[in-house]
């Protein structure tokens, strides 16, 4: 059982995992042939015996012989298998074993492998239902190159009242004459009094989440996983024998926990009297001599009001916002006078409608002496951080978008369709004289008769409802001026010795004012001070009036970009410092963020 510590709050026990311990990326050379006439069908209509014979025989023959024959004989077997029903467990087990063993002989023909696996899956599911679903899945998953089959299931939560019986039970495999070893491990909850273990949704990445047992990182050192009991047994071939298994060994380790000896048999762990010491995480692991490897996890809680406990179905929260992913090249070399396209291939899922979308292209020239150029993507999300506005070595740095050139952008406002490029109105703008054109709804740039001066670092930014969602970049240059570019995820070093605009340089005056000249000076200072106070009061009143009219955010306007319409882009602010109430004029919309795209509808 592998554990991973999650930052600050959790340790994830990756559980409910089924791994058969065999690599079946390709099930090759199962078509090792007996004769040019193909395989001999047995009485059940299955060619398994012939295949197994020649899989075994292949170890004593030259591999090229097997490879040459398999290419044109595999089809005979697979086409026949399409019309063959696997009626019994023994046939299914035998066929699966044949193909698992076959993988050791080579890479095989993937097209035929696909056909065999889909046929096996169909037969198993139709004839044997849920119990053999994993048998079928193993064959199907192999087609897609999955080395191990991991079946993530939600851990089971068990609440038991004090002094009541605690029974944990798992369905065990019934493969005839197979030997299995089971291990029950225990992670006590007692050391985690403030934050006991719980079942939570754990996300490996956006949209890829599983339910797992989460243990607070602060109590991991005190609450370690220990083996409680280990049991080995053999499954009998005849179901007439009861029980259908024989225990061959059992080891126990309960002394450290003060447990009474439980009732243990294959797939079962039972305590007669539940108490606080029994609460925690129980992990059942089964390993077999044929590569089986299964995990099941239980979260056991002490509940003094078990009669009032109601298991509610898990509620998966509805995804919000949007997801954008880009595929692109990080460099493009061109010749002067060439016309070419610079695309950003987008894959996206939009969960909230209506929405505002801004696709913009920014540009900074490249300096051939910079090796490399550096893009600080954190500055795209935090445009006004001082080190982003005044980065060290600015000629070789892309930091805040405020100090870059916006060469093109496309705006989709109040769009109610997920397919925004086809169903929503777009407003695009390209910097005049740039030699650029917008393509693919704003996600690509067309360079027309590209000049040397168009070489630069082009940064593509997607804003969804005013928030930056994706940042991508490409260096476009001639071969003579090519430089590499790398993305840094922190903030750039700030340039040193930059005079602050709010602190002008003042030269000290060492002249001494005589006592006789102090009266005119005081009079002048009093008059000047009075005017200054009056000016400050007027300025404060003007700011209050302006704030009430336009809200607490400032906006810049570029009427030339859209003709009669006015395009507004939010000036970023610190949301933690500015918590005043937003007032928006009637007829306009604001997304409520320092990075919000804001378009006045009345001017459209």
Curated annotation (Swiss-Prot):
Virion surface topological domain: 25-526
Residues carrying covalently attached carbohydrate according to the record: 117, 249, 303, 419, 505
Subcellular location, record wording: Virion membrane; Host cell membrane; Host cell junction; Host Golgi apparatus membrane
Disulfide bonds listed in the record: 370-396, 379-388, 415-424
Span(s) of short sequence motif Internalization motif: 568-571
Database matches in Gene3D superfamilies: Immunoglobulins
Pfam families found in the cross-reference section: Herpes_gE (PF02480), Herpes_gE_N (PF20418)
Keywords: Disulfide bond, Glycoprotein, Host cell junction, Host cell membrane, Host endosome, Host Golgi apparatus, Host membrane, Membrane, Signal, Transmembrane, Transmembrane helix, Viral envelope protein, Virion
Membrane-crossing residue ranges in chain numbering: 527-544
PTM summary: Phosphorylated within the acidic cluster. Phosphorylation determines whether endocytosed viral gE traffics to the trans-Golgi network or recycles to the cell membrane.
UniProt membrane topology term: Single-pass type I membrane protein; Single-pass membrane protein
InterPro entries linked to this entry: Herpes_gE_N, Herpes_glycopE_Fc, Ig-like_dom_sf, Ig-like_fold
Keyword Disulfide bond: yes
Signal peptide: 1-24
Main location: virion
Stretches of the chain found on the membrane's Intravirion side: 545-604
Stretch list, region Interaction with gI: 192-219
GO cellular component, one term: membrane
Family: Belongs to the alphaherpesvirinae glycoprotein E family.
Its biological purpose: In epithelial cells, the heterodimer gE/gI is required for the cell-to-cell spread of the virus, by sorting nascent virions to cell junctions. Once the virus reaches the cell junctions, virus particles can spread to adjacent cells extremely rapidly through interactions with cellular receptors that accumulate at these junctions. Implicated in basolateral spread in polarized cells. In neuronal cells, gE/gI is essential for the anterograde spread of the infection throughout the host nervous system.
Name of the protein described by the UniProt record: Envelope glycoprotein E
Origin species: Cercopithecine herpesvirus 9 (strain DHV)
Taxonomic lineage from the root: Viruses, Duplodnaviria, Heunggongvirae, Peploviricota, Herviviricetes
Gene: gE
């Amino acid at each position: 059982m592998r554990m991973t510590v999650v930052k600050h709050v959790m340790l994830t026990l990756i559980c409910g995992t089924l791994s058969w311990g065999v690599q079946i990326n390709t099930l090759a050379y199962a078509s090792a042939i007996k004769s040019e006439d193909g395989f001999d069908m047995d009485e059940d209509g299955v060619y398994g015996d012939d295949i197994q014979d020649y899989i075994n025989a292949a170890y004593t023959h030259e591999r090229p012989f097997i490879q040459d024959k398999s290419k044109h004989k595999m089809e005979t077997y697979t086409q026949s298998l399409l019309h063959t029903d696997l009626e019994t467990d023994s046939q299914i087990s035998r066929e699966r074993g044949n193909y698992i063993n076959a993988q050791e002989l080579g890479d095989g023909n993937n097209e035929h492998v696909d056909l065999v696996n889909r046929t096996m899956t169909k037969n198993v599911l139709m004839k044997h239902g849920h119990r053999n679903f994993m048998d079928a899945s193993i064959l199907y998953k192999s087609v897609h190159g999955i080395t191990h089959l991991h079946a993530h299931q939600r851990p089971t939560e068990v609440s038991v009242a004090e002094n009541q019986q605690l029974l944990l039970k798992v369905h065990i495999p019934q493969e005839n004459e197979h030997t299995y070893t089971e291990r029950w491990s225990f992670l006590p909850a007692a050391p985690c009094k403030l934050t006991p273990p719980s079942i939570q949704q754990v996300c490996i990445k956006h949209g890829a989440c599983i339910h797992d047992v989460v243990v607070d990182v602060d109590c991991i050192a005190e609450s370690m996983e220990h083996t409680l009991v280990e049991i080995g047994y053999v499954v009998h071939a005849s179901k007439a024998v009861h029980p259908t298994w024989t225990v061959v060994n059992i080891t126990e380790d309960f002394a450290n926990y003060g447990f009474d000896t439980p009732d243990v048999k294959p797939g079962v762990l039972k305590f007669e009297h539940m108490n606080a010491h029994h609460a925690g995480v129980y992990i059942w692991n089964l390993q077999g001599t044929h590569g089986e490897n299964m995990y099941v996890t239980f979260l056991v809680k002490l509940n003094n009001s078990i009669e009032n406990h109601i298991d509610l179905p898990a509620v998966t929260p509805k995804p919000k916002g949007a997801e954008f992913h880009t595929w692109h090249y990080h460099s493009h070399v061109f010749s002067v006078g060439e016309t070419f396209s610079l695309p950003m291939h987008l894959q996206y899922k939009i969960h909230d409608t209506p929405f505002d979308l801004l696709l913009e292209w920014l540009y900074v020239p490249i300096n051939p002496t910079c090796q490399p150029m550096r893009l600080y993507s954190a500055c795209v999300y935090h445009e006004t951080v001082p080190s982003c506005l005044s980065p060290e070595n600015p000629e070789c740095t892309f930091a805040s978008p405020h100090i870059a050139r916006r060469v093109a952008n496309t705006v989709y406002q109040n769009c109610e369709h997920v397919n925004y490029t086809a169903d929503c109105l777009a407003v695009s703008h390209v910097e005049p004289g740039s030699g650029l054109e917008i393509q693919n709804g704003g996600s690509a740039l067309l360079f027309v008769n590209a000049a040397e001066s168009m070489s630069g670092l082009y940064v593509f930014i997607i804003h969804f409802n005013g928030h930056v969602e994706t940042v991508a970049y490409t260096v476009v240059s001639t071969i003579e001026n090519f430089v590499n570019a790398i993305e840094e995820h922190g903030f750039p070093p700030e340039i040193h010795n930059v005079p602050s605009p709010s602190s002008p340089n003042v030269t000290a005056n060492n002249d001494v004012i005589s006592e006789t000249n102090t009266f005119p000076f005081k009079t002048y200072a009093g008059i000047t001070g009075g005017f200054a106070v009056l000016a400050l009061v007027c300025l404060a009143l003007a700011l209050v009036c302006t704030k009430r009219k336009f809200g607490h955010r400032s906006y810049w306007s570029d009427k030339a970009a859209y003709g009669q319409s006015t395009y507004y882009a939010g000036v970023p602010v610190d949301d933690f410092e500015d918590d005043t109430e937003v007032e928006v004029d009637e007829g306009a919309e604001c997304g409520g963020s320092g990075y919000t795209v804001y378009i006045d509808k009345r001017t459209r």
